[in-house]
Structure formats: C-alpha cells, structure tokens
C-alpha cells in the first residue's frame, strides 16, 4: 500500500525567541535567564553563545578567549593544593555574563597569601544524577534534595510542573564538602606521588531541571517552525542528558532523537522487519507485566463469555506471535464440562519478506492444543489494515452454532491515522455479532492536534514507563524493551499524517467512540481484579505496579499513573444514530 508523508506546514517565525515573563528559566542561576525577553539576534551578541544562554558581544570574543586561557592555566596551577578556597561564601551571580563570570573565577583561584589550605577540603563528588519523584513548588526551596543512586526508579517527570519549569530560582552557592577527608584518605595512601586533581561538581539536579526545560522549549520552537533554535536546543539536550542516570537519561535521548528527526524531516519511511518487531515485543513482554496484564484480563473476560458454549471462535486483531492464547487454551481444557471446539482467526500485517509467519504461529498453537486434547482450528489472515476487513471474509457461522469473540490489544489506536477507518472497523465488528469485544489500549492522549501538548503528554507517559522498566532484573530484556518504546516515541514525535500511527487515546475517549458506534460496556468481574493483583504480586520487583478498577474496566499503572486499560464491550440493542 502506498503511503503518503505529511508534515506540519511551516509557521511564521516569531518576532523573538521567547516572550512573556513566564519564560524565565532555571538555566545556570536564579537570576540568569535561558532566553532574555525580546532577544535581538543582531544586537551585537554572538548568536551561537546566545542560544546557549551566554551574553557575549562579538567584539569581546578575543578578551573572553584570553580570560578562558588564563582560567585554564590557573586551574592547572592549583592542582597540587586543591580547590578548597574556592567559593566558600561567594555567590557567583549571572554566569550568563560570561566575561564577568570568568573574571570572578580567576579572582577566586588566586587566594590571599594568608589563606589556609586544608587537605580535607575538596569539592564533594557529584550525587546521583537521577531526579527523584519530587513535587516542585513554584519557587524551588533553598535546601536542595539529595538524590541517592538507589532511587533511580523513583523519578516521575509528571511531578515537574510548568510553574517549576519557568519560575525563577534562588541563587546557589558552590560549597566544599565536609566529608572529603574520608572520601580521599584511602586513595592518598600509597599514591602521595600523584598530584591531587581538582574535582568538578556536576549538579545533576540542576541539569535535570534544565533538561526538562530544554525539551519543552525545543518542542515549542518546533511548533513555531523556529528550526534554528530547535536544532541548537537538541544539541544542548544531548549534552545535559549525559549528566543524568537511569530512566531520565534514556527518555531524554529518545525524545532528542525524535525531535531531531522531526526537525530534519527524517520520519522512518519503512517499518522495522516483522521479525525484529516481534523480538522487541517479546522482550517487552518478559521485562514488565503490561502485556501479561493485557492478555490475562482479556482472557479472563473471554473465558467467562464462553461459559457453557460448545463451539467458540476468537477473532484476534493483534495476533503477532500468538503468546496470548496458550493460557486460554489451557483454561478451556480445564473446564469441568470439558473443553469446547476452539477456532482461532489470527489477523496481522504482511511480512516484508513475504514469509507466512501467521501460519508458523498457528502450527505451534495446534501442537500445543493437541497436548491438552483441545479440538482446535486455526486460520491466519493477512491484511494491510484492519480497515480492509469484511465480515464475509471470516467464514462466520450462525450464533446458535458458534459463539464469537473479538480481541484487540494495542491495535485500534493505529486506525485513527486514517479518516473513517475506526468507524468502519467497529461497524464490521458489530456485524460479527460477538458475545464480547475485549479492548486493551494505552492510557494516554497522544492524538491531540497541538504538537506541544502531545509532546508534553508523551514525555510524562514514557518517563513513567521507562521508570518502571528500571525494576527489570534482566538487562537484555530491559534494553530491548527500551528500543521497543523508543520506536513509539519516534512515531509520536517525529511523524505526522498517515505515518503517525501511535495515536493513543484515553479510556474515556475510547468509551465515547465505542458508545457512539453502538456498543455497551461490560463490567469486568471482581475475579479478574483479584487474579490480576495476584499476577502482579508474583511479578518480581513489582512493588510500584498498581491495579485499579475504573467503572468496570481495569487499569495497570506505575505508582499513581495509569498506563494501560482493559475494557469489554458488546453490541447494543439500540441502533446507531448517524450524525
């Protein structure tokens, strides 16, 4: 199928890089601003340094370069004595004024003759670069939070509010550590012939706030078609991400890549090979409970719908490797009344190499069903899109003979890329007269028309997902799962039009769509909730996962943020009124 590539139409470049008092930044110090109001690029300031937040006139470049050389020489000269005299009580104001700031550093590096250098007074090593789950107030508190390395999975980007991003912050002091004697005493034994090297303090908390702010400003620049500014910010994001650890660094790197692809219009034209996608999804399945929860809750609803039925037929919109169905086959085999005849129709896209992967999956399921003495029929159905399906293609039998169930896990949102596609598919599903329709979707709104809002929502959502992955004990599964999610991030941020298929919507939005199409909700029973809770309890390192019931649907989230939702539906008796 031929695909079209759509991109946002360029918008007029704004008169300034940023306007309004609410754009005050955290970059560098409290009185420094990332972007001064009404910045004029031709006002004598060096443009590249201005983008990074430094005010340097082009005419002063030679003088600043000379001072930087002097600063480097001074730093080398104090290696034997350390930096204990540096900035005990001195506040360095406005480092955006690069010339004055470097000059103040030079002054600090030449202490008075009477100053006493204490061997134990070194700058403290940097704390963990992970930003913890902190509720930032509009004004940052004077006492900084200390972030331990063990809390790398506690970071929740959602906790960083817009007011925290743009409000002014108090000036910081650069202080020496009080415990450096213990830190360096062991290394001094037997190594006294080596000169003590100055320790550079990396404020990971500060950089983390700058990183979030740079991501947001870059998204705004992209939306305003200010691509020069956006390009410079992407480079800064990469620089700031290096100082972070764990989920924060990984999320920022994926979003920076996606922003760069959008800036340079490099949206991936060809999807990954089907085998690669299946491999990544399998690692995602193993590393965290999201897919397990999706399959388990859907299977529980299907099992209850099949109670007492002799012949059952599942139409799966998300066949992939068929990992959902062995558990259902086993549950049907254990029915007190005996297993029914089970027919499965698996639907999937064509493979790039034209291999019949759906048939291979079917053979594995047939062999598995034989071991459990379940009469099993399988048919694989290849379709470029679910919108290409017609009920007549599926060899449906009368409802008196065979009970039909339709299952969709993370598939329906892709139909939103094509106008009218979701309405057509839901109409076809209704023609199938299913006993139940199980739907699992991401609990997020990544389908809004405004790019900045979509970017912000996806940044919050995937930050939480990556945070939960930090609990995965298997590093290979975790790495592959991050690649799996990174592909989604790239599609949400970098692509537009028909190419943007990761159009996730919330449970509330899906309720509106399905109700408008003539479906009534089915409440998932309390048994499904209890069983899902047991599943999470058995999942290793799963203390942060939470199951909650929402008006008959079940949600799985990380701490307080729901991430996926399972709902069940049946065709309503009332006819759909066309609007």
Curated annotation (Swiss-Prot):
Taxon lineage: Eukaryota, Viridiplantae, Streptophyta, Embryophyta, Tracheophyta
Record-given protein name: DELLA protein GAIP
Domain remark from Swiss-Prot or TrEMBL: The DELLA motif is required for its GA-induced degradation.
Main location (coarse class): nucleus
Other observations noted: Its mRNA transcript may be transported over long distance in the phloem stream. Such trafficking may regulate leaf development.
Leucine repeat II (LRII): annotated segments: 360-392
Domain GRAS: 202-570
Key words of the record: Gibberellin signaling pathway, Nucleus, Phosphoprotein, Repressor, Transcription, Transcription regulation, Ubl conjugation
Stretches for region SAW: 494-570
Region of interest: Leucine repeat I (LRI): 209-263
């Amino acid at each position: 199928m031929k695909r079209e590539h759509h991109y946002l139409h360029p918008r007029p470049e704004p008169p300034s890089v940023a306007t309004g008092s609410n754009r005050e930044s955290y970059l560098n110090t409290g009185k420094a601003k990332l972007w001064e109001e009404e910045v004029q690029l031709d006002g004598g300031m060096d443009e590249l340094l201005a983008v990074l937040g430094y005010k340097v006139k082009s005419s002063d470049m030679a003088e600043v370069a000379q001072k930087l050389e002097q600063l480097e020489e001074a730093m080398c000269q104090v290696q034997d004595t350390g930096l204990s005299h540096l900035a005990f009580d001195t506040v360095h104001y406005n480092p955006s004024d690069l010339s004055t700031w470097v000059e103040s550093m030079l002054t600090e590096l030449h202490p008075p003759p009477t100053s006493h250098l204490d061997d134990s007074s070194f700058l403290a090593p940097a704390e963990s670069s992970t930003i913890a789950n902190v509720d930032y107030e509009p004004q940052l508190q004077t006492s900084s939070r200390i972030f331990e390395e063990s809390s790398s999975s506690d970071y929740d980007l959602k906790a960083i509010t817009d007011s925290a991003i743009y409000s002014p912050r108090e000036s910081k002091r650069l202080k020496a550590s009080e415990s450096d004697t213990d830190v360096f005493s062991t290394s001094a034994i037997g190594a006294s012939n080596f000169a003590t090297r100055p320790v550079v303090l990396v404020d990971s908390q500060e950089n983390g706030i700058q990183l979030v702010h740079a991501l947001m400003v870059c998204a705004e620049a992209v939306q305003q078609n200010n691509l020069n500014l956006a390009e410079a910010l992407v480079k800064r994001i990469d620089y700031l991400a290096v100082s972070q650890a764990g989920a924060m660094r990984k999320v920022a790197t994926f979003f920076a890549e996606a922003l760069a692809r959008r800036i340079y219009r490099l949206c991936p034209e060809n999807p990954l090979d089907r085998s690669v996608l299946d491999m990544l999804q399998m690692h995602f399945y193993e590393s965290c409970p999201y897919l397990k929860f999706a399959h388990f809750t859907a299977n529980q609803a299907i099992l209850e719908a099949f109670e007492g039925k002799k012949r059952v037929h599942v139409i799966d919109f998300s066949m992939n490797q068929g990992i959902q169905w062995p558990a259902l086959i086993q549950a049907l085999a254990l029915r007190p009344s005996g297993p029914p005849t089970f027919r499965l129709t698996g639907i999937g896209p064509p493979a790039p190499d034209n291999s019949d992967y759906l048939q291979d999956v079917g053979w594995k399921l047939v062999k598995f069903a034989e071991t459990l003495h379940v009469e099993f029929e399988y048919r694989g159905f290849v379709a470029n899109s679910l919108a290409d399906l017609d009920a007549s293609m599926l060899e449906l039998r009368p409802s008196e003979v065979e009970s039909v169930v339709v299952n969709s896990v993370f598939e329906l949102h892709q139909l939103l890329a094509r106008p009218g596609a979701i309405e057509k598919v839901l109409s076809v599903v209704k023609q199938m007269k299913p006993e139940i329709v199980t739907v699992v979707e991401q609990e997020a709104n990544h389908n809004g028309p405004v790019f900045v809002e979509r970017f912000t929502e996806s940044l919050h959502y995937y930050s939480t997902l990556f945070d939960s992955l930090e609990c995965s004990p298997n590093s290979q599964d975790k790495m592959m799962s991050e690649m799996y999610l990174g592909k989604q991030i790239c599609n949400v941020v970098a692509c537009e039009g028909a190419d943007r298929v990761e159009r996730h919507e919330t449970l509330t939005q899906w309720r509106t769509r399905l109700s408008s199409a003539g479906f009534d909700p089915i409440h998932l029973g309390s048994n499904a909730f209890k069983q899902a809770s047991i599943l999470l309890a058995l999942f290793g390192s799963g203390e942060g996962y939470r199951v909650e019931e929402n008006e008959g649907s079940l949600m799985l989230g990380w701490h307080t943020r729901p991430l996926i939702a399972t709902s069940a539906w049946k065709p309503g008796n009332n006819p759909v009124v066309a609007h």
